[in-house]
Amino acid sequence: MEPPSEPEPEPQPLAEASAAAPLRAPEVARLREEQEKVVTNCQEKIQHWEKVDNDYSALQERLRTLPDKLSYDVMVPFGPLAFMPGKLVHTNEVTVLLGDNWFAKCSAKQAVGLVEHRKEHVRKTIDDFKKVLKNFESRVEFTEDLQKMSDAAGDFVDIREEIKSDFEFKGKQRIAHKPHSKPKTSDIFEADFENGVKPKNTFDADELWARLEELERQEELLGELESKPDTVIANGEDRVSSEEEKEGADTGVNVVSPVTDSSAASSCKRRAGNAGLPNGQVNSLNYSVNGSNSYHSNKDDDEEEEDDDDDDDEDDDNESDHAISADNSIPTIYFSHTVEPKRVRINTGKNTTLKFSEKKEEAKRKRKSGAGSHATHELPAIKSPADIYRVFVDVVNGEYVPRKSILKSRSRENSVCSDTSESSAADVEDRRGLLRSTSSEEAVATEAGGSSLDELQENHPKKPLPSGVSEAFSGTVIEKEFLSPSLAPYSAIAHHALPTIPERKEVPSEVSEEPTKRVSKFRAARLQQRS
C-alpha cells in the first residue's frame, strides 16, 4: 500500500495585476487561458484522488475477509506480464509501509484501521481541490465577461466603486484640545450690575483684605498652639511625649512650657527644652513662672552661659541652688566632628594617624616664637573626640611631635600632658583637699534637710575656688547626629578654655563621706599649665 501523496500547490493566476494597466484583448485572453489551466489541473487531481479512494475501499473489504481461511490459492505476479500459481498463507499477518522504507507487521484488523485513517486524508484532499476548482470557475466566468466588455468598448474600461458614507464607528471620536483655547461661553459668568445692586456673595476690596488679615492671624495662632509641647510634671519630673520631642528637635519653632509656681519646675523645664534641641542652641525658649512669661533669645542664653562660667568654681551644696535661677541646667555638650579645610596626616606607626591643621599650627608657632622659648605651651580647645589626640603630643624645639600611644609619654620633661611633674603632683594634693572640703559641706547640707536649705544659703555663702583651679566638666556629651532618647550619654571632660556648665547634683538620702578621687591626665595637664 502506498501512502497518498500531498496535493500540489495551486498555481497562482496572473492577474488581476494587469487591471491597473489598460486592458487589452491579448492580455485578457492570456488571463483566461491560465485560469482554465488551473481548472483542468484541479479536475485531474480530483480524479486521481477519487481513484485512490476507491482502491483503499477495495483493500479495506479484502482485509476484512482475509482472516476467514488459513490459506488461499492465488496467482502470484512474477514480473510485469508473467504469473504463476501459489498459495497465500499467514492470512492474519499484514506488512504495512509506514513511509521512508519503514515497514511494520500488524494484524488484519489493525490494517483495516490504518486504511480508514488514510481514506479520511484522501477525502479531505479531494474537498480542498473541489473548493479551488469552484473558485477558478467563477474567475473564468468573470474573465469571459471582461473580455466581452473590452471587445465592445475598446482598450479602455471604466471601473467604478460605490462607497457608502454612513460608516458606523464603534468608539467615540476623540478631538484634541488646543493648548490656548478659550473657555466655553456657558462657563463664563456675566455679572449684571446695571441696577446698582451687588450680589450677596461679592465683597469689596477692603472686606477682602480684612478677611485675609483675619485668616493670617488665625494661621499664626494655630501655628503657635501646634508648636507648644504638652508638658506634664509629676513628682518633680518632666514627662514629654516622644512625638513632641521630635517636633522640637526637627523644627526651630518657639517652645512654650507652662510651669507651676515652683521654681524647681522651671529649671527642669529649661533642662528638657535644652536637651531636645540640636547643637546646644535654644531657639526662642519661653519660661512662664507664677503666670509671667519671659522670652529669652539665643543672645540671652549666651549671656547666661557666661554667668554660669563665672559660678563654675563654686560648690553646689544642694539642689535648691539650681532651682532658684533658671540659668542652671543639667550639663550637656552638643558637639559635631571637627571638619577642617586643610589637614596633614601624620602616621605614628601603629595604625594611628594624627590630623593637624597647617594654619593653626603655624599660628601657634608664631605665638611661641614671639613670647620666648620658655613660654607656656597653649593647649588646644577640646570640642570633639578628634581634638583629644592633639593634646597628647610632645614639644621638641618648639614643634609638636606625635606620640605612638596616648597612654604613654615619650619624653616626660617636654611632654605637654605629662602627669609626673612636681607641680602637677602638688596640684593633685591641693585638689584632693578641696574635694574633701566640698564633700563635708555636702554632708552638712544633706543633714539640714529641705527646710533649712535657705538658711544655709544665707549664713554660709558660697566660697569661690582658688583662681588657679578650674572645675572639670563631668556632665554628658551628645553628638548631634544621634539625637535619640535611647542613646545613653557618656561623661567627658571639657577644657578650661570652654565655658563649663555646673553639674546638677542630687542630695543623697544618707550621709556618706566621699572617697579620695584620682586626678586624670587632663586635669593634671590643666593644673600644670595654671601653675
Swiss-Prot record:
The keyword Mitochondrion appears for this protein: yes
Protein modification: Phosphorylation occurs in response to androgen treatment in prostate cancer cells in a mTOR-dependent manner. Phosphorylated; hyperhosphorylated in mitochondria in a mTORC-dependent signaling pathway. Phosphorylated at Ser-369 by RPS6KB1 in a growth factor- and rapamycin-dependent manner. S6K1-mediated mitochondrial phosphorylation at Ser-369 disrupts the URI1-PPP1CC complex in the mitochondrion, relieves PPP1CC phosphatase inhibition activity and hence engages a negative feedback diminishing RPS6KB1 kinase activity, preventing sustained S6K1-dependent signaling. Phosphorylated.
Region described as Disordered: 1-24, 224-381, 408-470, 500-531
Molecular function via GO: chromatin binding; phosphoprotein binding; protein phosphatase inhibitor activity; RNA polymerase II complex binding; transcription corepressor activity
Reported tissue expression: Expressed in the spinal cord, ganglia, choroid plexus and olfactors epithelium of the developing brain. Expressed in skin, lung, kidney, testis and muscles (at protein level). Expressed strongly in brain and kidney. Expressed weakly in skeletal muscle, lung and liver.
Top-level lineage group: Eukaryota
Phosphoserine modification, residue list: S369, S439
Xref: InterPro entries: Prefoldin, Prefoldin_subunit_alpha, RNA_pol_II_subunit5-mediator
Quaternary structure, from the entry: Homodimer. Component of the PAQosome complex which is responsible for the biogenesis of several protein complexes and which consists of R2TP complex members RUVBL1, RUVBL2, RPAP3 and PIH1D1, URI complex members PFDN2, PFDN6, PDRG1, UXT and URI1 as well as ASDURF, POLR2E and DNAAF10/WDR92. Interacts with POLR2E/RPB5, RUVBL2 and RUVBL1. Interacts with PFDN2, PFDN4 and STAP1; the interactions are phosphorylation-dependent and occur in a growth-dependent manner in the mitochondrion. Interacts with UXT.
Protein name, per record: Unconventional prefoldin RPB5 interactor
Source organism (scientific name): Mus musculus (Mouse)
Gene it is expressed from: Uri1
